[in-house]
Amino acid sequence: MRKTLLSLFMLVSVAVAMAEDYTQYVDPRIGSIGLGRTFIGPAMPFGMVKPGPDCVNMPNAGWAPMPEKVAGFTQTHVSGTGGGQKYGNILLQPYLDGQQLREGVMAQRRIGETIDLGYYSCLYQNHISTEITTAGRCAFYRISYPQPGRLFIDASWFLGKDTIPDKREAQQLVGTHVSIVSPTCVEGWSSVRGGWNNGDAYTVYFSLHTDKAFSVLQSDEQTCRLAFADETVNIKVGISYVSCEKARANIPANTFGQQLATLRAEWQKMLSRLKYQGTEKNMRMFYTALYHVMLMPVNKTGENPKWADSPYYDDYYAIWDTYRTSTPLLGVYYPEIQRDIVNSLLNIYKNEGYMPDARSGDCNGRTQGGSHGEVVVADAMARGLDGIDYELALQAMIKDAEVPPADHEKEGRGGLQEYNTLGYIPYGIPRAGTRTVEYAFDDWCIAQVAKRLGKEDIYDKYMSRSGNWRNLWRTDYEWKGMKGFIMPRDAQGRWLDSVPWGKSKVYHPLIPYRPDTKVAPWYLPWWNTFFYEALSAEYSLSVPHDVPGLIDACGGADAFRKRLDTFFAEGHYNVANEPSFLTPWLYHFIGRPDLSRDRVTRIINENFSDQPDGLPGNDDGGAMSSWLIWGMLGKYPLAGTSQFLEFPQDDAIEQKSQNDMLMCFVLNRQYRNWPYSYRWNGDILEVRCNTAIYNIHRNVVDNASGFSWESAQAKNACYDNVSGTFGFISKAAYAALLAKGRFTYDGITWRKVDETAENIHVRADKDNTEMWIAKDRELPIVMKMKNNPLGIDWDMKQ
C-alpha cells in the first residue's frame, strides 16, 4: 500500500489548461479614459510592439475617444503612465486620393471603432477601415479602402512633440531615414530623444511589407506616400531597436487571422494561471487588470543596441510604482518572467553601473523615490526564484546604498551622502522625506538578501540603517489628536515648523508645515517637494518593513487604529497613490483583518469599475491593476518577503499558481483530491502534499537520481532531509532527457516518446509505465501517469 501511494506522488502536475476562455473577460477599454491612461491597442504579453492609433492631442498611450481625430497608427506605446509621453514611432495613415496634409498631419475623423483583446479596428468618415493585431515584434494591418487607396508613412512622427527645444519630458527628433526597397517593401528608422525619462536617443528601425504592389507618389528622408490599385491591403511592420535587417527578421509568416489566433492563445495561457469566479462585472475587472499587468515591462531580449547579454527587459515605468504589488504578483504566478526581469536588472547593472528604478528607450531614469531594485531582488529571493546570481545582486544593491551616482535622477540614490552621514536627508534636498523612508526600506531589503547569503556583518549594518525612518519621526508633533509624524528637519537636526513655499528668486514666503501640506504651489511638480506624490499623513503610515515599530511610535494599537480611522475619515487616503497601497491593510497588524477587509472592499466598490474610467489613477505599468487583483483575491503581499496579509472574500476565488496544484486520483474506489504545493525557503524546497511536509535541499532538487518514498498519509508528518525528489524529477535528470532523450531514475531508464508545447511524454523500459513531465517550469514536475502496474492512473488539475 505504501508503495502504491508513493507512486501517486510522482504524478504531481502544474496547471492543466482550463476549458473556460478567460480572454472573453478582457476589455482593453477599462482604464483608458480619465486617469488610468491604459493602452487600448493589441499587445502580446510583455510584447515590444504595441500598435494603435495616435490622436492629434497626443495622449500618453496614443488613443483618445471620439470625436478626437486620429493622426495615424504608430507601432510603439506605453500603458498607464503619467508625466511626459514616450514613443509613438513610425506612423501609418491610410487616406484617399485628394486628401492633403495640414500642418504635417493628415488627421481623420472616426465614425466607428472596435476595441478587443488583441484586435483594434476603426472606420474613418471616408469609409476607410483599418484593422490591427500584433505579434511581439511585428504589427499586422488589414486596410480596406472604398476605392483604390493611399498610405502615408511618417518616420518623423512621435508623441510629445513640443516647440520649445529641449523642454523637459518632451521628445525631440534626432534623425530619420525612409527607403523604398521594392514595390512591396519600405524600410527605415527614426531616432528620438527625451520623453518622460529625459533619456538619450533611441532608434526604432522598421521593415514594412505589403501583400499588394504599390506605386510611389512621394518619398524623402522622413516620409513617403504610396498608392495601391487594390481596395484591400495587408501590411506587416517588423520593428527592431537594432537594425532594419533585424526588423525584417522579426516578421512572422502568419496571416492576420492566424496571428490574432496565436495572440489570443498566448493570452489564454497566461490569464489561466489565475482562476477567479465572480459576477461578470468582477470577472471583467479582474482579468482586464491581470492583462494590464503584463503590458509592461517589455521583453526586448535580443533587441538591445548596447549589449548582447540576455535576458533584457525595458520600459520599467517605474519600479517605484510596481514593486509593491506587480513585483510580488509576477513572482508568485509568473516566476519564469520575474526571474528574467531580475536578471535583466542585473545585466543593466553589469553594463551601465546601476540597476534602474525606472527605464525606457534603453536609458535609465527617472528615479522617483528610492533605489527599488533592492526590493525586486529581495522579493525574488524570498519567493525562492532560482537561476539568479544573488551574489552579484547584493553587489549591485550595495553600490546603490554606498556610491553616489553622477545623475541621481537617472539612477542610484540622491542625497546619499547626507543620508549615510546624518541618517536622514535634510529638508532642501528634493523629496527628502520620501527618500529617507524608502531608503530605509531598501536597506532592509539589502539586509534580508545578505542574511540569506550568510553575510552577517552586511546584514547587521543595513538592518541598523533600516531604522533611519525614525530619524524624521517627530514624536512631539500632534495633529488632529494624533501624535508623531514624519516631518522635515534641517541638516543641523532642527525640526522645521515652517518651510518656504515655492522657488521664486525674489520671494520666499514661509508657510506652516502640517501633515496635510504639499510643500509647493501648483506650478511646481512633486519632484521638488519634501514628499513625492504624497503627504506626511500618508508617508507616516508607510513603513512596510517595520509596521510593529510604527505602531509603537504611534502610541500602541488603540492609537494606531484611531489614526487609521481618522486618516480615512478625513479624506487623506488616496487610492491612486502607491505609498498608500498598504494602508487599508494595516488593520491586520492590530488584529483586525475584518477592518482591512471592510476598507479594501469599500475602496474597490467606490473607485474601480468595468467602465472606460474604471481606474482611479495612472495604472503605472500595472501597479494600480495589480493592487486591484490582490484586493479581489483577498490577500496582499508584503513586498520583499514571502508573506501575505489575508482575509476571506465574498466571491469564490481559486488561485492558480505554478506551484499550487491539485492531485486527482482514484484509490480504494474513492475519488481523491490532494493539495500539492511547493515553496522555496532559502536552499530548502518545502513540498506540501495532503497533510505532509517534505523538506528537500537544493542539492537534491538539482542532482537526485530517484524519488522519495515517504508517505503522505501520515497526518501532519514532517520529513526533513528528504533524499529524493517528490512529485518531480531532478534538474539533472531533466537535463539528460533534453540532451539524450532519456534519463535513469531509481535504476529504471525512461525514454522520450513524444512531446507537446507543455509536456515531454516518457515511457519506462521496465514495465511501460508512462509519465508526462512539464516543460519550461521552475521544477520538472510529473504531470500525469498511465499504465501504472499498481493499477492507479491519474491526472493533475488546478
Language-model features and meaning:
Residues 1-20:
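Bacterial Sec-dependent N-terminal signal peptides
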